[in-house]
Amino acid sequence: MNKKVNEPIIIEFGDILNLEYIELIKNLNIELIKYILYSRNQCSIPVNQLLSEFKNINNNNNNYNNNNYNNNNKIKIPFKKKKFIESLISLFLEIDEIYFNCLDQDEELPIVVSVLLGSSIFNLKEVYIFYFGSYNDYKNGNNNNNNNNNNNKSNNGFQHDENRNKLREIMMKLVIESPDSFSVLQRPLKTNICIYKKINNITDCLNNIYNNNNNNNNNNNNNNNNNNDSRDQLFIPQQDFQLKIKKSTKITVFNFTNSNINDKFDFKITEISLKSISKNSDHINNENNTNSNNDDNSNNSNNNNENYMWYQFHTSINGVN
């Protein structure tokens, strides 16, 4: 049977994750992005090797600077390659900040993380979607790996080893089940990362982003890679998750839930949209608050609809080879 236009390739991971292990989820996102960039020919060697070489070169050059050696002995990194690495480092810091805020402020984790490859955000060649589902689903027993340990968010040695083993298991499965399209080389493209999540206080958050972006515009030449707070993220004011695509856009979904992806997403010829997560949350709220009156439930529904947003990271990555 011929594959339908924009029919996604779905790699099923089931309930392999526990969304209370925030460090694992964060590291998984970063490793998946690294894997996609290398597999899709956006860099000529694995990302970890690239970052290691970059670090060694910088250390070597710093030694020359500190000892006043001849600058001719310093190793020069090609501009595009240097920009690629610096963008990666900046992006990973931004991702780290998102998940740190989830832990520090007890926010829900992103429901969707998407990796977008194209000549621009409006001309996408390939879309990769990591679907994690709502944290409420996990709290209500849909994740078999969940437990009642109140210390799940702690980073003890045992948990560190378990997370590392789980990450290795996921990456091995991904290598084995990678789609055939990965065997076809892709030319260097621009990579953007978007996430869809619930924001607890959307008004304050948007005001902070607006003010920080204004400050950034006034200080464009003073960009610092270590500045990884909210000013490095660009909000897209759109409640529904939608990606504009082409008929030729290739879609791959990594499903980290037991849900049927087609029950969660609408895959159309020109767009990908996420079906209402807030309805699921409302259903859970109604079950847990049976004594609430209809007005309260209506207010909860409105709040859920307003608080779910998706946004695009400020940092984009231009592929090199």
From Swiss-Prot:
Protein origin, superkingdom = Eukaryota
Q: What are the start and end residues of every segment in region (Disordered)?
A: 280-306
Instruction: Kindly list the cysteine pairs connected by disulfide bridges.
Output: none
Q: Residue ranges under compositional bias (Low complexity)?
A: 286-306
GO BP, sorted A to Z: regulation of exit from mitosis
**One of the record's GO cellular component terms:** nucleus
PANTHER family in alphabetical order: MAD2L1-BINDING PROTEIN (PTHR15681:SF1)
This chain belongs to the protein called: Putative uncharacterized protein DDB_G0286405
